[in-house]
């Protein structure tokens, strides 16, 4: 008599140790799971709600300055080291891991207008209202030694900004003109100017390192070529630009922080139209800095908040504010793309998470898998009204909220006036101007 026996391979269901999870057989045939989409929708909704519950972006406040923080700089090789310059001429070096100040330098008389590090991280440069450029060692002096600069350059005018070349021993300063300096010389190797107004900021391109951009008080953004020692082109906007920042991953893209509450992302090959206009701030934008990934940037504003924008979106994905934080003067995104630092005029430097609900520290494999799964679910259902409303909701201070309502009314009034003008004019006599082109006055080559 032949008997047929059911047999299973123990490797398919027996755990190796009692700490392992029980293996559960699953059949992924869609016909057997008719309610898969409703289940995923509920999971996406719960994941979105939990993201808002765990959104605690504020990490630390670094206090010690006796005046407003005017500028920040990152160490090119050490993630934990940050430099800050204040309005009383004091420069401090901070350790972000220990969250304390490790060195204090009285660098200038008056404001520290700019600070930048050398590309190798051995020294840093500062400029101030006392018409000097000073180079300092990154490592402090020995016990009993006085704090002295390595090198001091006495200028003829006030310098308002400084930036170092990404690969060579060359740096640029700005004031009445843009000067290019060799570190070993006390006179500029070349000077470039276009116009007569003072220049507030200068930045080297991190990819095409011979290119640099500057913004002036006469509403210009000027691009220079260091090899030819001449200006290339300039774009004139409606209002003054405070600073610019180059995209670290795309050589031709830069973002300008403007006085008209907007940020403009330009492609330097076609300056007549911005790639994107970023609108959400309700006061002048004072500083901007890119994430190392080049996908997002953070902006600091006079409206006492900082916002994180995706490069390809006109609206911010995140806004950070606190009760005590006043006008935010400077902002930096750390080199590991995880944290944001901002300096404000109530003398504090604040440290934030780049992703408000991110869990810090080492994640287990199951935590990583759950995080990735929830992220995919949120992307899949992001346009559903209920999920979209929860994901976009932010608590704002009353001052910012009321200004947003006021700006919305003004914008609607302008739109209505434009529509009426077109309606009651001869067809074709009133041109339609897109939002992107409205703010560009001219491009000069």
Curated annotation (Swiss-Prot):
Stored CDD domains: WD40
Entry's Gene Ontology BP terms: decidualization; epigenetic programming in the zygotic pronuclei; maturation of SSU-rRNA from tricistronic rRNA transcript (SSU-rRNA, 5.8S rRNA, LSU-rRNA); oocyte growth; proteasome-mediated ubiquitin-dependent protein catabolic process; protein ubiquitination; rRNA processing; spindle assembly involved in female meiosis
Region annotated Required for nucleolar location, chain positions: 353-441
Principal place of residence: nucleus
PROSITE patterns: WD_REPEATS_1, WD_REPEATS_2, WD_REPEATS_REGION
Pfam families per the UniProt record, alphabetical: Sof1, WD40
WD repeats, residue ranges: 64-104, 107-146, 149-191, 194-234, 236-276, 280-319, 323-362
Expression tissues: Expressed in the endometrium during decidualization. Expression is down-regulated in preeclampsia decidual tissues.
UniProt pathway: Protein modification; protein ubiquitination
A GO MF term: RNA binding
Residues recorded with modification N6-acetyllysine: 49
Keyword annotations from UniProtKB, A to Z: Acetylation, Nucleus, Repeat, Ribonucleoprotein, Ribosome biogenesis, rRNA processing, Ubl conjugation pathway, WD repeat
SMART domains attached to this UniProt entry: WD40
Compartments where found: Nucleus, Nucleolus
Cellular component, GO, one term: centrosome
Subunit (UniProt): Part of the small subunit (SSU) processome, composed of more than 70 proteins and the RNA chaperone small nucleolar RNA (snoRNA) U3. Component of the DCX(DCAF13) E3 ubiquitin ligase complex, at least composed of CUL4 (CUL4A or CUL4B), DDB1, DCAF13 and RBX1. Interacts (via WD40 domain) with DDB1. Interacts with ESR1 and LATS1.
Function: Part of the small subunit (SSU) processome, first precursor of the small eukaryotic ribosomal subunit. During the assembly of the SSU processome in the nucleolus, many ribosome biogenesis factors, an RNA chaperone and ribosomal proteins associate with the nascent pre-rRNA and work in concert to generate RNA folding, modifications, rearrangements and cleavage as well as targeted degradation of pre-ribosomal RNA by the RNA exosome. Participates in the 18S rRNA processing in growing oocytes, being essential for oocyte nonsurrounded nucleolus (NSN) to surrounded nucleolus (SN) transition.
Family as reported in the entry's similarity comment: Belongs to the WD repeat DCAF13/WDSOF1 family.
Annotated protein name in UniProt: DDB1- and CUL4-associated factor 13
């Amino acid at each position: 008599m032949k008997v047929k026996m059911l047999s299973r391979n123990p490797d398919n269901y027996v755990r190796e140790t009692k700490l392992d999870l029980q293996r559960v057989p699953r059949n992924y045939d869609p016909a057997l799971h008719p309610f898969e989409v409703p289940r995923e929708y509920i999971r996406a909704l719960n994941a979105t709600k939990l993201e808002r519950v765990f959104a605690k972006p504020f990490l630390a406040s670094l206090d010690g300055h006796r005046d407003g923080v005017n500028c920040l700089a990152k160490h090119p090789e050490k993630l934990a080291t940050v430099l800050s310059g204040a309005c009383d001429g004091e420069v401090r070096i901070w350790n972000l891991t220990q969250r304390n100040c490790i060195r204090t330098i009285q660098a200038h008389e008056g404001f520290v207008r700019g600070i930048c590090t050398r590309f190798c991280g051995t020294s840093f440069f500062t400029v101030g209202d006392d018409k000097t450029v000073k180079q300092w060692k990154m490592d402090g002096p020995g016990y009993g030694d006085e704090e002295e600069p390595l090198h001091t350059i006495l200028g003829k005018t006030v310098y308002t900004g400084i930036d170092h070349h990404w690969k060579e021993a060359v740096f640029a300063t700005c004031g009445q003109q843009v000067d290019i300096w060799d570190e070993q010389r006390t006179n500029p190797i070349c000077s470039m100017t276009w116009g007569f107004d003072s220049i507030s900021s200068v930045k080297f391109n991190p990819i095409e390192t011979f290119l640099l951009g500057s913004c002036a008080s006469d509403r210009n953004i000027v691009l220079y070529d260091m090899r030819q020692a001449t200006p290339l082109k300039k774009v004139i906007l409606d209002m003054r630009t405070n600073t610019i920042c180059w995209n670290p991953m795309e050589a031709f893209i830069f973002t300008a922080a403007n006085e008209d509450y907007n940020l403009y992302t330009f492609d330097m090959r076609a300056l007549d139209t911005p790639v994107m206009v970023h609108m959400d701030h309700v006061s002048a934008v004072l500083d901007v800095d890119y994430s190392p990934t080049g996908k997002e940037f953070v902006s600091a504003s006079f409206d006492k908040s900082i916002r994180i924008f995706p490069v390809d979106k006109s609206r911010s994905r995140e806004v950070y504010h606190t009760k005590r934080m006043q006008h935010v003067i400077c902002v930096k995104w750390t080199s590991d793309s995880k944290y944001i630092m901002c300096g404000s005029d109530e003398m504090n430097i604040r440290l934030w998470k780049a992703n408000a609900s991110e869990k810090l520290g080492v994640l287990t494999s199951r935590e990583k898998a759950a995080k990735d799964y929830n992220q995919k679910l949120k992307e899949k259902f992001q346009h559903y009204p209920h999920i979209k409303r929860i994901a976009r909701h932010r608590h704002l201070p009353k001052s910012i909220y009321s200004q947003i309502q006021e700006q919305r009314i003004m914008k609607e009034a302008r739109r209505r006036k434009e529509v009426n003008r077109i309606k009651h004019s001869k067809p074709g006599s009133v041109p339609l101007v897109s939002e992107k082109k409205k703010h560009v006055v001219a491009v000069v080559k």
